[in-house]
Amino acid sequence: MTSPDQLQTFSLRSIAVAAFGPTLLFGIGQGAILPVVALSARELGASVAVAALIVTLIGLGSWFFNLPASLVTLRFGERWSIVGAAVAAGLALAAAATSALAPNGLWLLAAAMVVVGMSGAVFGLARQKYLTEAVPVAFRARALSTLGGVNRIGVFIGPFAGAAAMQFFGISGAYWVGVVAMAAAALLSLTIPDLATPDAPLGGDAGSQPTLRSVAVSHAGVFLSLGMGILLLSALRSSRQVVIPLWADHLGMDATSASLIYGLSGAIDMLVFYPAGRLMDRKGRQWVAIPSTLLMGTALLLIPLTGSFVGLLLAALLIGFGNGISSGLVMTLGADFSPDRGRGQFLGLWRFMADAGSTGGPVLLSGVTALASLGPGISATGVLGFAAAAVFAVVLPRLKHRRNY
C-alpha cells in the first residue's frame, strides 16, 4: 500500500524523463520504419503478399514473445530488460538497413523484423511492470495513460524523421533513424533504478516462484472475463487502422486525402490521453472503458454510411477521440489485477491476450469483407465495440475484490 507521505511527495514530473523518455524514443524508432518495411521487401524482390507478411512479422514477434518476455524481465530486472530490448532492436534495425547488401537480404530483413517485435514485447512489458511498482496507485492510470500516449506520439513523429533522413540516405535512412532512436532509448534507460520486487517473500526464502501456468490457473477468472474485454478492445483498435484508408479508397479518395483523415484522427488521439488517465484515477476505470468502446463502435458503424470526405473525417475524429481516451486502459487494468508475486508472468499473459485481439481484428474484417463486402466487414468490427463495452460494464464491478488495491 502507498503511504500518505508518498502520495503527497510523488509527482509524475519527477520520473518523466527516465520513465517516459525511452518510450518516446522507442516509439520514434518504430514509427520511422513502419512505412518503409514493405517497400524494402519489394526492393529485395518480394511479392506484394510476401512484403505484407514481413510487415506482420513485427506484430507476430511481439505477440508470441510476450510470455518469454515475462521470464526475461524476472531474470534481469526492469532496467536491464529495457536496456537490452532497445539494444537488440537497434542491432536488428542496423541489420535491416544493410539488408540490400546481404546475399539473402530478404531473409535478413524478415529476421530483423521478428527481433524488432520480440524486443518490443520485452520493452513494453518491463516498462509497464516498472511503472506499476514505481507509481502510487492513486497516480497509476495517469502514469500508464501517459506511457501509452507518449508511445503514440513517438510513433507519430517517427515517419517524419524517417522521411527527412531518406532525403539524404535513401530508404535505409529510415532504419538509421531507428538505430539512433533505439541507442538513445538504451542510454536513457540506464538512468532507471532497479526496483526491489516482492517476488520473494520476506525472510529471504524465495520458495517456489510463480510460473506462467500457476498464474494462469490462479487468475483464470480474470483472464476469461475481463481478459475477453481486453481482447475485444484490442481487436477494435487494430481494425480502425485498416478501416479508414480502405473506406477512403472505396469512396475514390486519393492517397493525400486518406492520409489527411488518418493523420487528423491520430492528432485527436494524442490530445486526450492525460485527461482520460486523470478521470480513471478519480472516478474509476469503467468511466473510460465503457465510453471509449461505445464511441469507437458507434463510429465504425457510421463509416459505411458516409459518402464524402467530411463524413468520413467526422467518423474518423470520433474514432480518434474514443481511442485516445482509452490510452493506457489495457495496461492500467493489467496493473490493477496483477499479483505482487508473479506480476511479470501475469502481465505477459495479459499482453498476449491483447496482442491476440490486435491480430484477430483485421482478420475478422478481412473474413467478413471476403464473404460479403467492405461495408458489412466494417460494421462487424463496430459490433466489437459494443461487445467490449458490455463486458466491461458487467465484469469490472464484479471483480473489484480481485484488484491489488
Task: Tell me the role of every PLM-derived stretch.
Residues 59-67, 155-156, 266-274, 358-359:
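Residue-level signature of mid-helix packing/kink "hotspots" within the transmembrane helices
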Residues 65-78, 272-284:
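Helix-to-loop junctions at the C-terminal end of transmembrane segments
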Residues 114-151, 333:
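Cytoplasmic helix-loop-helix junction between adjacent transmembrane helices
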